[in-house]
Amino acid sequence: MEESQGYLELYKSRQHDFLYPLIFQEYIYVLAHDHGLNRSILLENLGSDNKFSSLIVKRLITRMYQQNRLIISANDSNRNPSLGHNKDLYSQIISEGFAVIVEIPFPLRLVSSLERKEIVKSHNLRSIHSVFPFLEDKFLHLNYVSDILIPHPIHLEILVQTLRYWVKDASSLHLLRFFLYEYRNWNSLINPKKSIFVFSKRNQRLFLFLYNSHVYEYESVFVFLRTQSSHLRSTSSGALLERIYFYGKIKHLVEVFANDFQAILWLFKDTFVHYVRYQGKSILASKGTPLLMNKWKYYLVNFWQCNFYVWSQPVRIYINQLSNHSLYFLGYISSVGLNPSVVRNQMLENSFIIDNAIKKFDIIVPIIPLIGSLAKAKFCNVLGHPISKPARADSSDSDIIDRFVRICKNLSHYHSGSSKKKSLYRIKYILRLSCARTLARKHKSPVRAFLKRLGSELLEEFLTEEEQVLSLIVPASSTSRRLYRGRIWYLDIICINDLANHE
C-alpha cells in the first residue's frame, strides 16, 4: 500500500510539476543512493534493520529552518554516529535527493513533446560518437572556428532562477534556494570567494544539472536567431526550447546596443553556423569572414553579461582558421587538412595535369596526453615504458587479465574512430606488457620467461571484437589491415572514458 501511495505521489507530480512531496519519499533517496551516495548516511539505525528512511531527511530539513541549524548536538552524535562526524551531511543528503527530484520533469516533458509532434525517439543521439560524423559532414565546408570557454555564473542563485522557467513548484525552488544559501554560508568561513567551485566538487550531480540547465538557456539563442533569420521553423528543436521570457531579454539587449534589434540581426544571418558543446567548452564554426566571427564574439560576451549575469571577456573566445587549427575535445584531435591528388586529362593530342586538393577531416588519438593518463594510473612511466601494477598483484591471474583486457577494449572501443591507428597500437602494447609485468611480478619470474610460457594466449585476450571478426572473415595476408584502418563510430557510448578524458 505504501509503495502504491508513493507511485501515486509521483504521478501527481508528473501532472502538475509539483515536486515538493517527492522530497519526503523514501524511494527517491534509495535511487539517489544508487548514484553514489554513501550507504551509511541514510540508515535510521545502524545497529538494527538497516532500513533506508526519509525520517532523517525530514529532520535535516527541519533543522535547516531552525535557529541552531548549523550545530549538531552531542546527543545526536551519540545516538547516531553517522550524523556526528560528517560536516557536509546536509549538503550530501539533500543535494543528492534534489538532483534526482529536479531531473524528473525534464525527460517527461521531452517525451510528451516528442509524442505530441510524432517525432521518433532515437537513443543513438545520446552517443558521444554521434557528434563526430556531424563534424565530418559539416566542417569540410566551413572556414573559421571559435574555441569558447563557457563562463561560470558568479552566484548559485542564478542557477536557481533558470529552473523557474521549467519547474512551477515554488516550494521546491524555495527549499533549493535556501539550501544553496546555507551551503554558501557554511563554506564562507573557509573560502568565501570560491564557494561555487567548492559546491561543484562536492555536489557534482546537482551542480551539473543546474549548470547544464543554465548553459542550455543561453545556448538556445543560436537556434532562435537562426530561425528568425531564415524564417523557417525547426520541428526537431521546438520540443527542446522554452521561450517564455526570451522577448523580455531582447528588450534588455536593445538597451545595451542602443539600436533596434532587427537592425543588428543582419550580423547573424549566417546559415552556416554550427555549434557544439562539450564539458566546459564549446565550438562555434562558420563559413563567414573574420569580421563576422568577431561580431559573434562580442555579441556573446554582451549577451552573457547582460541577460544571464555571467562575467566573460573576449579573450576567452579564440578565433582560428580551420585549415590551420586543430580541435582538441572528447579525447580526440580533429583537424581539416588538404588531401592532394593529381589527375591526368587526355584531350585528343594534348594532355593536361590537374592538381586537386580535397579537404579531409582527420581525427586522431592524442598519444602524449593519453600516455600521461596511463602514467597517472600507474600503467607506465611518463616516457611510456610499461610498468607493473603492485596493487593488482594480490588478485588472481584471471582477475588481473580481465581488468587489463577490459581497460584495453574500452579504450579501443572509444577511439575506434581514429584516422590513424598507430597511436592506438602503442596504447595496446603498453597495457599488454604492463599486464605481463604484473603477472610476472606476482609469480616472481622474468617477464620474458613468463611470456614464453604463456604463449599467444595473452595476446588473444587483448584482441578487440573488430580484430577477431576480421581475422575470421578476411585472410591475414589480405586487406584486413586496410579494413581495420577505417573509422568506426559506435552509437552506444554515452560517457567519456576516464583514461581518454584529459581535461
Swiss-Prot record:
InterPro entries: Domain_X, Maturase_MatK, Maturase_MatK_N. GO terms for biological process: mRNA processing; RNA splicing; tRNA processing. It comes from the Eukaryota. The keyword tRNA processing applies. The keyword Lipoprotein does not apply. It is found in: Plastid, Chloroplast. It holds the Pfam family MatK_N. Keywords: Chloroplast, mRNA processing, Plastid, RNA-binding, tRNA processing. GO terms for molecular function: RNA binding. GO terms for cellular component: chloroplast. Belongs to the intron maturase 2 family. MatK subfamily. HAMAP family: MatK. Usually encoded in the trnK tRNA gene intron. Probably assists in splicing its own and other chloroplast group II introns. PANTHER family: MATURASE K (PTHR34811:SF1). This is Maturase K. It comes from Liquidambar styraciflua (Sweetgum tree). The gene is matK.
